[in-house]
Amino acid sequence: XNPELRCGLKD
C-alpha cells in the first residue's frame, strides 16, 4: 500500500 493512500492495507 501506499503511505499516502491510507486505505488500511499496510502493504
UniProtKB/Swiss-Prot annotation:
Tissues showing expression: Expressed by the venom gland.
Q: Quick check: keyword Secreted in the entry?
A: yes
What are the subcellular locations of this protein?
Secreted
- Principal localization reads secreted
Keywords from the named record: Secreted
- Record GO cellular component, one term: extracellular region
This chain's protein is named Venom peptide Ocy2
